[in-house]
C-alpha cells in the first residue's frame, strides 16, 4: 500500500495495512478495541456515502456483533448496546440521552470493572499488632478486620497517610486509568461506579480516551457532516492537514501524498497547516514584542487544550492569552477570504481542536475537525489510500512545520523576530505537557514566573504526541526528521509575502 517497510508489531501492521486504526489506540490499547472502534467509524462512513444511514443505523450493532455468543462482554446484548452508543458518537451525538455539550463522552455501557477505592489493603496485610495504618488515619476510615485491615471508602480522604505508615507495603494506591490520566482531576464516578467527566473542569485534551482498557471513553466525530459536505455539489470543501501529520505515517508519506488522496476523496483543495504556523509565528512575534516592551507576560493560544486549561482553571490569567489565532484558524480564514462559502476541514492528531471549533467560536475557523482515524475511515469507505510521494508540495517553512513539536512555537516566533531585525532577549517557558503547563501557570498566577512568556502544549512532545497520533513518538520523530530534512529553507516572513495576508485578520477579536 505504502511502498516501504515500517517496523510495527505484527498485529499493528495487520491493522495498519487494513486501515483499521483509531485515535491513538494503536499505541495504547489492544487489537480488539482498535478494530471495533474503527469498524463503527467505517460502517457509519460507508452508510453516509451510500445515503442510507437512517435505514441501516440499527443494523450496525448486529453487523459488527453477529452472535450468537459474546466475544468480550457478558452477553451479546451488552456488546450490541456498546456498539449502538459508539454509532451515536460517530454521528456526532452523545452516546446516551443526556448531552452536556462536551466533545469527550463516556460510553456508560462500556465502563466497568475498574477499582473505585483509591487506597486498598492487599493480601500482604497480616493484621499486625502495630496497626500503624489505623494510627496514621486522621479520619477514622480504617478498622481492623478478622484477617486484615479494612478501609471504608466513604470515610477515606485519599491522603495516603496509611500507605506511607504501613511498614509492610500492604496498602496499594490504585486509581482508575482514566482518572489517573486526567491532568485536571475532571473525572469522578457516580453511585453505580460509572466514570463521569466534569464538563466544567475538562480541558478536552483526550488523555482519558486511550487510557481506558475497555475503550469506554470517546469523542464525537464530524464524519457524517464532512461526508454530506463532500456529496453536496454546491459546496467547495477544503482539507487542511496539521503540521504533526508529517512523520506519522512513515518516511515516504508526504504532504503531497495527502494532497492527492484528499483530491481523490472529493475535496476541492488542500493546504498544509504549516503555512498557518508561519502566519501565527509572524503575528505572535509582533504581539510578544509589544508585550515584552510593556513588561507584560503572555501565554500562547495555538494549543486549545492549554487554552481550555487557562480559561477553566486559571481564569484570572485569561487576559494573558495571546489574541493571535491558531494555525488552523489562520489557514481557514485565508481560504474563506478567497471563497466565503468554503467548508474547511482540519485533519490532525488533536481531540481538543474539536473543542476549538465548538467552544471557542472563532469567526472563520475550521468548520469541522477529523482525527487521523476518522479521515482514514472515510478514505476506506471510498477505497482511497495514501501513497508514497515526493516533497514537491510545500507551503510552510520548516519553522511552521515544527510548530507541532514542543518548543516549535517558540523557535518560530524567535525566528520571525530575527527576520524582522529585532534582537529581543525574550525568555520563554516551554511547558511540555499538561503537568508542566499547570506548574508554569501556578507560577504566573503567583507572580513568580521568571520567564516572559509561556508556550503551553497540553500533550507531551507537542501536537505530535496528541491522543489521536498514529505512531509512537520515537518512530514519528525519526520519520519527521527525515522528511523535514528534505524541505526547502524558505524564511517565515518571506514565505508570507506570497499570500494575501491583508485580506483577513490574525486576531480573535
Where are these regions (language model features)?
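Iron-sulfur-associated redox domains of electron-transfer enzymes in respiratory
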Residues: 2-86, 90-92, 219-509
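N-terminal [4Fe-4S]-dependent radical SAM core
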Residues: 96-122, 139-140
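Cysteine-cluster motifs in flexible loop/terminal segments that predominantly coordinate metals
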Residues: 112-118, 128-134, 159-162, 205-208, ...
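Gly-rich Lys/Arg/Thr-decorated short loops/hinges at beta-loop-alpha junctions or inter-strand turns
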Residues: 114-120, 143-148, 189, 207, ...
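A secondary-structure boundary/capping signal
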Residues: 121, 152, 198, 241-242, ...
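Residue-level recognition of alpha-helix initiation/capping sites
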Residues: 128, 157, 173, 203, ...
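Iron-sulfur cluster-binding cysteine motifs and their immediate structural context
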Residues: 130-153, 157, 161-198, 203, ...
Amino acid at each position: 500500500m505504502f511502498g516501504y517497510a515500517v517496523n510495527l508489531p505484527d498485529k499493528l501492521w495487520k491493522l495498519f495495512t487494513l486501515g483499521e486504526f483509531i485515535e491513538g489506540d494503536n499505541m495504547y490499547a489492544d487489537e480488539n478495541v482498535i478494530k471495533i472502534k474503527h469498524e463503527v467509524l467505517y460502517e457509519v462512513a460507508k452508510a453516509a456515502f451510500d445515503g442510507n444511514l437512517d435505514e441501516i443505523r440499527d443494523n450496525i450493532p448486529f453487523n459488527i456483533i453477529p452472535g450468537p455468543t459474546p466475544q468480550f462482554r457478558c452477553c451479546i446484548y451488552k456488546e450490541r448496546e456498546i456498539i449502538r452508543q459508539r454509532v451515536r458518537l460517530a454521528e456526532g451525538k452523545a452516546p446516551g440521552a443526556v448531552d452536556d455539550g462536551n466533545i469527550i463522552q463516556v460510553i456508560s455501557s462500556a465502563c466497568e470493572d475498574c477499582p473505585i477505592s483509591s487506597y486498598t489493603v492487599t493480601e500482604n496485610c497480616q493484621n499486625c499488632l502495630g496497626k500503624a495504618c489505623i494510627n496514621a488515619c486522621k479520619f477514622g476510615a480504617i478498622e481492623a478486620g478478622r484477617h486484615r485491615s479494612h478501609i471504608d471508602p466513604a470515610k477515606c480522604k485519599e491522603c495516603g497517610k496509611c500507605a506511607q505508615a504501613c511498614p509492610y507495603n500492604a496498602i496499594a494506591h490504585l486509581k482508575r486509568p482514566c482518572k489517573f490520566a486526567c491532568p485536571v482531576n475532571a473525572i469522578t464516578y457516580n453511585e453505580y461506579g460509572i466514570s463521569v467527566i466534569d464538563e466544567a473542569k475538562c480541558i478536552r485534551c483526550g488523555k482519558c480516551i486511550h487510557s481506558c482498557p475497555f475503550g469506554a471513553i470517546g469523542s464525537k466525530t464530524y464524519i457524517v457532516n464532512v461526508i454530506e459536505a463532500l456529496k453536496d455539489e454546491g459546496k467547495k470543501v477544503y482539507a487542511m492537514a496539521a503540521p504533526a501529520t508529517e512523520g506519522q505515517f512513515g518516511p515516504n508519506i508526504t504532504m503531497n501524498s495527502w494532497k492527492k488522496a484528499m483530491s481523490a476523496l472529493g475535496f476541492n483543495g488542500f493546504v498544509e497547516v504549516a503555512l498557518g504556523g508561519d502566519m501565527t509565528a509572524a503575528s505572535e512575534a509582533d504581539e510578544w514584542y509589544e508585550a515584552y516592551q510593556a513588561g507584560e507576560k503572555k501565554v500562547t493560544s495555538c494549543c486549545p487544550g492549554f487554552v481550555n486549561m487557562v480559561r477553566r482553571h486559571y481564569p484570572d490569567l485569561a487576559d494573558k492569552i495571546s489574541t493571535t489565532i491558531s494555525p488552523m484558524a489562520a489557514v481557514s480564514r485565508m481560504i474563506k477570504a478567497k471563497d466565503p462559502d468554503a467548508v474547511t476541514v482540519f485533519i490532525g492528531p488533536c481531540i481538543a481542536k474539536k473543542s476549538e471549533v465548538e467552544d471557542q467560536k472563532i469567526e472563520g475557523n475550521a468548520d469541522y475537525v477529523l482525527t487521523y482515524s476518522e479521515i482514514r475511515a472515510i478514505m476506506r469507505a471510498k477505497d482511497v489510500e495514501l501513497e508514497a510521494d515526493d516533497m514537491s508540495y510545500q507551503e510552510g517553512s520548516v519553522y511552521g512545520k515544527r510548530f507541532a513539536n514542543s518548543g516549535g512555537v517558540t523557535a518560530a516566533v524567535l525566528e520571525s523576530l530575527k527576520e524582522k531585525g529585532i534582537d529581543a532577549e525574550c525568555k520563554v517557558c516551554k511547558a511540555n505537557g499538561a503537568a508542566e503547563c499547570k506548574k508554569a501557570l501556578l507560577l504566573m498566577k503567583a507572580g513568580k514566573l521568571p520567564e516572559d512568556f509561556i508556550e503551553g502544549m497540553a500533550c507531551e512532545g507537542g501536537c505530535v504526541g496528541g491522543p489521536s497520533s498514529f505512531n509512537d513518538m520515537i518512530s514519528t520523530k525519526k520519520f519527521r526528521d527525515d522528511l523535514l530534512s528534505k524541505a526547502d529553507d524558505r524564511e517565515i516572513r518571506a514565505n508570507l509575502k506570497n499570500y494575501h495576508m491583508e485580506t483577513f485578520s490574525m486576531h480573535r477579536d
